[in-house]
Amino acid sequence: MLQHILLYLINPLAYIVPILLATAFLTLVERKILGYMQFRKGPNIVGPYGLLQPIADGVKLFIKEPVRPSTSSPFLFLATPTLALTLALLMWMPLPLPHAIINLNLGLLFILAVSSLTVYTILGSGWASNSKYALMGALRAVAQTISYEVSLGLILLSMIIFTGGFTLHTFNLTQETVWLLVPGWPLAMMWYISTLAETNRAPFDLTEGESELVSGFNVEYAGGSFALFFLAEYTNILMMNTLSVILFMGSSYDPTMPQISTFYLMMKATLLTLIFLWIRASYPRFRYDQLMHLVWKNFLPLTLALILWHAALPIATASLPPLT
């Protein structure tokens, strides 16, 4: 009995706490990188080299008074930030790092389904705020997320044809000889751009276009509830990059030293996250019609063509993948 309690209590905590810590320090890394790319220092007052800045920010946000517009929907307004962070953390469960918390047979499908649910948190927060700016930001976010999920789903389908299974562990086994980045580089490029759009990052951050919508769907949020949204966004960024590494740059697994494969995996994920920040510092925001044009008129035909190609090639050459 005690063993079960420890298993179901310590296991989730052992993966939630490091994720939240990584998320907190990712905000610091982002501010530092943006600072140096704009020829300034970034946060450097709190602690040595500003290392305690995320802790100071967290404490400040959570001790602030929870302000709520009087016209907003009380339950939905407070439930959506909590749900956003819960879903963001839930998506980490089937990821093999190198061992998953829950080893699902349809791990990819689970991640895709949960990431689709995050749309409801954005829509709920925008609608519950009872503000036209928040609602416009939420509607934009929903259209953007749903559109890019189409391309993400189709790219995943191509990758599944490569490996012959939905289980994320099979991706590691498939890539023992060569990374799937090599045969599937067009897919990898489209996948990376789609993850940028899916996580509402620059240059696709139309949901929080400061120049037009004040701050987007979270404009009415302050204090703790805003911090939860912030944590959810950055947790999603880390999760998407870790998933990108598992799909395209599979980690080398050593059964005697699983820590080394975890270290390599996180190094690659950190590298991809730094490219996210580099892109944010380098590119201006897309126009809304360009955003939709990119996914529906460029990515969709290309991904469909690649699915046909990847499905037809093994059959034509009689080399079916291992359908485990």
Swiss-Prot record:
Subcellular location field: Mitochondrion inner membrane
EC number: 7.1.1.2
Uppermost EC category: translocase
Catalytic activity: a ubiquinone + NADH + 5 H(+)(in) = a ubiquinol + NAD(+) + 4 H(+)(out)
InterPro entries the record matches: NADH_UbQ_OxRdtase_su1/FPO, NADH_UbQ_OxRdtase_su1_CS
A GO biological-process term: aerobic respiration
GO molecular function, one term: NADH dehydrogenase (ubiquinone) activity
Signal sequence bounds: none
Keyword terms, alphabetized: Electron transport, Membrane, Mitochondrion, Mitochondrion inner membrane, NAD, Respiratory chain, Translocase, Transmembrane, Transmembrane helix, Transport, Ubiquinone
GO CC annotation: mitochondrial inner membrane
Membrane topology summary: Multi-pass membrane protein
HAMAP family, sorted: NDH1_NuoH (MF_01350)
Family indicated by similarity: Belongs to the complex I subunit 1 family.
Purpose of the protein: Core subunit of the mitochondrial membrane respiratory chain NADH dehydrogenase (Complex I) that is believed to belong to the minimal assembly required for catalysis. Complex I functions in the transfer of electrons from NADH to the respiratory chain. The immediate electron acceptor for the enzyme is believed to be ubiquinone.
Full protein name: NADH-ubiquinone oxidoreductase chain 1
Species whose genome carries this gene: Squalus acanthias (Spiny dogfish)
